[in-house]
Structure formats: C-alpha cells, structure tokens
Amino acid sequence: LCTYTVGVAIVDRSSDPKRQIDPLAVTTASPPKLETDLISPLRRYWGYSSFRPLQERIVRSLLAGHDTCVVMPTGGGKSLCYQLPALVSGKTAVVISPLIALMQDQAAALAQMGIPAAVLNSTLAADAQAAVMGKARAGEYRLLYLSPERLARADTVGWLRQVPVAFFAIDEAHCISEWGHEFRPEYRQLSRLRTHFAERPIAAFTASATRQVRHDILAQLQLRNPDKYIASFHRSNLRYLVRECAGGEQMDLLVRGLRNYRDGKVIVYAPTIARVEETVDYLEERGIAALPYHGKMETEARKRNQERWMSDEVRVLVGTIAFGLGINKATVRAVIHLALPKSIEQYYQEAGRAGRDGHSADCILLWQQRDAGLLAFFIGKITDAAEKERSWERYHIIRRFVDSNACRHRQICLHFGERLKREDCGACDVCGSAPGWLSAPVEGVRPKRKRFAPAV
C-alpha cells in the first residue's frame, strides 16, 4: 500500500469558496487512472465546474474497481462520490441506505437531474416492485436503492445476480459496527455481498466513525485492500458552545439565541416528541415562528414542514433526531441541542448540519442534569451486557466532553483519532469565544457552577 497525506487544503467550490475540507489521510493500493472525462458529466448533471479533490479521487477509485472506504463530514459531498461513477460506468450502482425517506429523496432528486434511479422497498405495491426489478435486470437504472432488510431477503440475491451491477455503495456504514453510535443488526447481513458478488467492488461511506469503527467496517464488509479516504474532522467554521442549565435557564437561553440568529436557518434538537411539541408552543407564545418534526406526525405533515423550512418560509425547525439525514441546506447558522446527545458521534453528525456554506455557524448544547440522568436511567435498563457496556462508554465520553475544560474542537478531533496542532481554537466556549447572550446569567435563576473533569 502507498499511504500518504495530501498536503493542500481541499476547497469545496461547489457551494462556497470559503468552505474547506482538509484531508486527514489517503491510502490507495495504486493510483487510479485519470483518462476518463469526469468534468463534462459533473457540469452537465450537477452544475459544478470542478471537484473537491477528495471527491475526484474517490470517484476514480470506484471506476477503477477498487474497494473503497470514505469518511467525510456531513455535507462533504459523499453522495456525488457514488452517484457520478454510477452514471459514468453505464451500469447500476446498488446503494444500501437505512432510511426509506432518504432513499426516496435521493432517487427523486436524481430523476429531476435526468439520471435514472429507483427505490425498491416494501411500501411499493407488488406490481410496482415487479416493474422496478424488471427494469433493473434490463440495466435501465444507474442507481438502485435498497434497504439492508431488503438485501437480507433470500430472493433478493437471486434477481440481483441478473442486474448489471457496477458496485455496491453502503451509506451510513457505521451502522454495521456494534461500536458505532447507530448500530443496526440488519447491517451485519451486508457481509454476504462479498460471498455472493465477489467480483464487484464495495464502497463504504460514513460521516462519523472512530478508528475502532473504521476497522470494524473494513472487517465486516470484508473489503479487499481498500482505498481509504479520511477527511479531517476539524470544522473550523463552526463554534462549539456548551452550557449546563439550571431548571429555568434552558428555554430562556433558547429564546435569547433564536433572537440573536436573525439570518439563516436554525435547527433545534429536542430529546423527545413531547419536548418538541412543548418547545414549539413555548416559542410561538413568544413570537418566534417554529415548526415541529418528529416520527408521530403524518408523513405529509412532516414533509410539508420540511419544505416550508427549506424554502425559507419559516426559519426555525424543532425536531427529534429523525430530522436531518439527507437534508442539504447550506445556510443553517445554528444547531441547538436541548439535551445531552447519546454520543460524541451523534453530536458531531447533528451539529455538523450547521455552516455547510463555509460561513461561521454555532453549535450550541444546552443540557441539564435531569436529561443526563434520564439517559443514564435508560442505559441501566439495557439487558444485553455488551451493549450496556458500550452505551456506558459512550455516555462517559460525552459527559467528559461537556464537563471538561479542554478545547471542544480538540476533544472532538481526538475522539476520532486526529490531533489538532493549535492548543487554542478560538472557536469554542472553553477557548473564550462564548457570545454575551449565552454567558450572561438568566434573571431570577442561580447559574450553574462550572465543574471540570479531566481533559480527554
């Protein structure tokens, strides 16, 4: 293997010239050949005149038939990395994704661009499923989206053998690892791809994977001498702000913050459906328009609220973790959490939906001891010993993150195996960058005394 680190900043010209994604490490078995013209289809279908350099290398790795592992931050352009080679190959890329709604959104967007794509899932009528399978066998699709559950069905492998498959792309690949923050047992079934399609390349894509999870992904998918593309986890345009709140502080601080962010979008994450509804009502009563988004809403209502938020009709959306996957909105100026996330990985992925345009954005965590206690209570209820141990480990790491006096950026990067050179990031509350509205006391509420734990 040839292992090297690219020594230049990778500029994302597809969204904003200020946005940079720095490569952490690139490992390839052999340099991919560069003859194929990729700029013409990139310009014709996506409207971009140039790549982010990591994107082009990933595309060429797949066109060269290499197994590939990609770790790239939220909003880094991972989807294009498998959509473009699928288009250029003239065959069908089979994309495995965990959420039906996300697959449907991507397939619809591709269809609007003139790229034939389809989703095969159980929500389709039997005749519609048969039609999709027939067109797939005829090679009419450039991308075919399946859930891991669908792939696990005994009949799926049989008819997939009749499809002209270019490669398999595993989205949200961290779901395959028991050490990942979103482990899904059905993802373990994906190991059968290597058995039944030994000659086809497999590509794994994720935004948040520690070294341990990355090794697990490679092992579970049985990737052969894979090309590895690991982008830097440092999002320098984001400001991480953490505050432990006393009983009456949290909602007052939320209102302060929303009145401060008058330009751009805001996502507010609440831990439960009830808290989503309560928060929306609280904000509306104070003259701040906000929309809810959670799993108990009717599908059309969720979709309508998402569209109103995306179209700039309403600035603030309050949701559970169900909101965000696949959302491509560059102008989010703040992501605010109203409870302690279950893990650093979850927080990094959700907070990373801010500032995708490369401009400054804030990631604010307003947590309370009661929510941390509730999280610990549910971990205590887990019956599987191994899963309980992993959950406690994730819990203690996120607690150290919020309690520590170490730079927030450094803590996040260290968690993913990356060391920042700067001791003082200048872009987090620990390094003295908290805005006045967040650091000022709330009237009538005794502020929480800062408690520091050892740095990570």
Question: Which residues are covered by each model-predicted region?
Answer:
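Short, low-complexity, intrinsically disordered N-terminal modules
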Residues: 13-15, 78
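Helicase motor core with emphasis on the C-terminal RecA-like subdomain
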Residues: 28-32, 36-45, 49-53, 57-79, ...
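A conserved SF2-helicase RecA2
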Residues: 371-410, 414-418
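Accessory DNA-binding and partner-docking regions appended to nucleic-acid-acting proteins
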Residues: 4, 8-13, 23-41, 390-392, ...
